[in-house]
Amino acid sequence: MHCPFCSATDTKVIDSRLVAEGHQVRRRRECTECHERFTTFEGAELVMPRVIKRDGSRQPFDEEKLQGGMLRAVEKRPVSMDEIEQALSKIKSTLRATGEREVPSEMVGNLMMEQLMSLDKVAYIRFASVYRAFEDVSEFGEAIAKLQK
């Protein structure tokens, strides 16, 4: 690790501890040249799979797009940002756990609907109506009937 003060290449670790619920390591370091101290954080780089769109094109996973879709679905509903962040985290964890380099967009959409169903039924119907491209009232009725089972 290079010293951010003098650019020396030799630093020593003085203290290490787990932070962020064990997902990161915080290290206190000291430069052996200038004796300045600084802190570094180390965490695993988790790569999200690429998304295969319905038209066959592929694009990188876009967390902002996922969050935007969820925020639109829960707009003006009694759902906290913590609940939204937890749901998004579950979706990302599930996608990473597949171990696949690419996942179909249908999988992402279905995971989103699962999370919305447990968060807020109205938000689920909102998202499903757009995602499944409902064309008439009967399709809304079918989705609502599915919720009542």
From Swiss-Prot:
Keyword flag Zinc-finger: yes
Domain called ATP-cone: residue spans: 49-139
Keyword terms: ATP-binding, DNA-binding, Metal-binding, Nucleotide-binding, Repressor, Transcription, Transcription regulation, Zinc, Zinc-finger
Cofactor note: Binds 1 zinc ion.
GO MF, one example: DNA binding
InterPro entries: ATP-cone_dom (IPR005144), NrdR-like_N (IPR055173), RNR_NrdR-like (IPR003796)
Flavoprotein recorded as keyword: no
Biological process annotations from GO: negative regulation of DNA-templated transcription
Obligatory cofactor(s): Zn(2+)
Mapped zinc finger ranges (unnamed): 3-34
Pfam families found in the cross-reference section: ATP-cone, Zn_ribbon_NrdR
Family indicated by similarity: Belongs to the NrdR family.
Function statement: Negatively regulates transcription of bacterial ribonucleotide reductase nrd genes and operons by binding to NrdR-boxes.
Protein name: Transcriptional repressor NrdR
Species, as recorded: Shewanella baltica (strain OS155 / ATCC BAA-1091)
Source organism phylogeny: Bacteria, Pseudomonadati, Pseudomonadota, Gammaproteobacteria, Alteromonadales
